[in-house]
UniProtKB/Swiss-Prot annotation:
Entry keywords, A to Z: Cell cycle, Cell division, Cyclin
Gene Ontology molecular functions: cyclin-dependent protein serine/threonine kinase regulator activity
Gene this protein is translated from: CYCD2-1
Keyword Cell cycle on entry: yes
Protein name, as recorded: Cyclin-D2-1
Similarity annotation: Belongs to the cyclin family. Cyclin D subfamily.
Ranges of Basic residues composition bias in the record: 298-308
CC per GO annotation: cyclin-dependent protein kinase holoenzyme complex; cytoplasm; nucleus
Native source species: Oryza sativa subsp. japonica
InterPro entries linked: Cyclin, Cyclin-like_dom, Cyclin-like_sf, Cyclin_C-dom, Cyclin_N, Cyclins_cyclin-box
Magnesium as UniProt keyword: no
GO biological process, one term: cell division
One Pfam entry name: Cyclin_N
Region annotation Disordered: where it falls in the sequence: 286-308
Length: 308
């Protein structure tokens, strides 16, 4: 922690410390955007195409200012300090078992704040305090169990801040971001983009095979998503064992069986269809084509039967 509270005097605000804590604890949970649909859901809600389009239209409101990346590249904002803060956030996320969305939101709050406000230069504790406060706010938004502000700093190596100091920083962040914490994130779109096209097509193809009648809809949906992610090398680690944790009630055996069947029948049929189409194109483009400028092949003379 900084040696003297005066070092953090820029964090002081007119409100009583208790009021600041109350604001953080109560108002964050009730704050809403102007449009209730513009919120992060972490994959728990389904959106229509119109809702997704509306979210895309409003996502810039939850992003840093447009000049922020250039300020990082030009080092007017220290990119190394930002990278260190992001690394710390990811370590604490893993240590506490937080959702990936929580870490993403913390970095989002930090970037948005840095694009709007200036931290004291040469004060390493200020950047770390910002990271702690942003992660605290993100955890309050998304996590069921939130560690105490002291426990949240278990991975901090240089400074440990008092709860009241963190709460003051939280209040500054909330003010700078206009209390807009329900950010639109990549997690908002993943379900829609991934399932709408690839997974839906797989379920549709599977519908024609009677072997899938042995499987419940939830297993088919999980298997379709697994097949879709299997086509992406970076997502090859996703498997039925992980899929069973997506929702209470899913059975690993059912998902695994349906997944194997879908790989054999649906993906196999698609590959065979593609191969057949390629073969047809090959014959039509090469085997059955000839140069119209060249003379036609000579006709064979019909041989007469002997004795004629």
């Amino acid at each position: 922690m900084p040696a003297d509270d005066d070092d953090a005097s820029y964090l002081l605000c007119a409100e009583d410390a208790g009021a600041a804590v109350f604001d953080v604890a109560v108002d964050i949970s009730t704050c809403t955007t102007e449009d209730d649909e513009c919120c992060s859901v972490g994959g728990e809600e389904l959106y229509s195409a119109a809702s997704i389009a509306e979210l895309i239209g409003g996502e810039a409101e939850y992003s840093p200012r447009s000049d922020y990346p250039d300020r990082l590249r030009s080092r007017s904002i220290d990119p190394a300090a930002r990278a260190e803060s992001v690394s710390w956030i990811l370590k604490v996320q893993e240590y506490n078992g937080f959702l990936p969305l929580t870490a993403y939101l913390a970095v989002n709050y930090m970037d948005r704040f840095l694009s709007l406000r200036h931290l004291p230069e040469g004060q390493g504790w200020a950047m770390q305090l910002l990271a702690v406060a942003c992660l605290s706010l993100a955890a309050k938004m998304e996590e069921t169990l939130v560690p105490s502000l002291l426990d949240l700093q278990v991975e901090c190596s240089r400074y440990v801040f008092e709860p009241r100091t963190i709460c003051r920083m939280e209040f500054l962040i909330l003010t700078a971001l206009n209390w807009r914490l329900r950010s639109v994130t990549p997690f908002t779109f993943i379900d829609f983009f991934a399932c709408k096209h690839i997974s839906n097509a797989m379920v549709q193809n599977a519908n024609s095979d009677i072997q899938f009648l042995d499987h419940c809809p939830s297993s088919m949906a999980a298997a379709a998503v697994l097949c879709a992610t299997g086509e992406t090398p970076s997502l090859a680690f996703v498997n039925p064992e992980l899929a069973v944790n997506w929702c209470i009630g899913l059975a690993e055996e059912g998902i695994s069986s349906c997944y194997q069947l879908m790989q054999q029948l649906v993906i196999g049929n698609v590959q065979r269809s593609a191969a057949a189409a390629a073969a047809v194109n090959l014959f039509s483009d090469e085997g059955l084509s000839y140069d119209s400028s060249s003379p036609p092949p000579p006709k064979r003379r019909k041989r007469s039967p002997p004795g004629t």
